[in-house]
Amino acid sequence: MNNEYYDCLVVGAGPAGIFTAIELTRLNKDARVLIIDSGRNIDSRRCPARVTGKCVHCKPCAIVSGWSGAGAFSDGKLSLSSEVGGHITDYIGQKEAAELISYADSIYCDFGASDEVHGLNDKKVDEIRYECSKHNIQLVPCPVRHLGTERAFDVLRAMYVHLVTNTHTTFMELTTAKEIIVRGGRACGAVLEHAGEEFTVEAGCVVAAPGRGGADWLNHTVKNLGIVTENNEVDIGVRVEVPNSIMDHLTKHLYEAKMVYYSDTFENKVRTFCMNPGGVVSEEHYENGIAVVNGHSYGDAARKTENTNFALLVSSKFTSPFDDPIVYGEYIAKLGNMLTGGHLFVSAQII
């Protein structure tokens, strides 16, 4: 296993890692790609809590680790706007960002995503925006393609089957990166660990996309390599669950209403996130023992509930000398866990 060579080594099998492999193999059908992840392949991921309702603290956590990351059990909401989800326009501009979003969306459709896109009725969007403005709330228009939890799994599995069957892509489950190898200022491989054995893989390039579960590893790695980084905002809040009747005047037109409010006293940015009409609230546990909440909804109407849930988040941007917003978020989550005795009556959600 030592000293194998791949054109690209991808650390992390979440959406970023998967799409890296899809694009590379489209550009070069002979490209040899190795994707590693600390979790299992998509067909082997099993979360006991989804059956029993009780987390047994599996290691690695089947909810956040493995092929497709946390997306395997998410409800697959694709936000088709550069106005949400990050700062991509800071790097490539509005026009190119829109083109890339459309391209990524087309790939999801190639693998079986649903045809319906919500939030395209401009007249209704304008009416809702007008009503929001009366309360100093900004509505961020954003078309949404909703796959549903069951279809999201099927789409991500189809990507897995395509890559390992039709391309020169290899997926290694239960494998971690110990160290990225750099020579002459260029990443050219990594020291990996699988089943207690360390081995070296050489690669033409390395893509590090470990997701939330690998944030600590990535932070440690870039510091060791002397890479300068900038922290994004940290969003901390609660997940709210209400009857559908309270939110359906928004969700039946937008599916997910993305709203932003700035508080009067300190002008804190407060926003809605991850809205799930007819959805369910789920419990997740990170490997550091923190219990958190998430939400999802099914595409199948028969599996819809009578409730809508969404996260209500406050954004905080830290400056020097504090430079570890993830630790801050984890600390708040731990306090929430402590106050509830580990139960999810109230829980912080870290984004």
Model-assigned labels for residue ranges:
Residues N2-G85, K123-D126, Y130, H135-I351:
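Residues forming the flavin
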Residues C58, G66-H118:
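Dinucleotide-binding Rossmann-like beta1-alpha1 core, especially the glycine-rich loop
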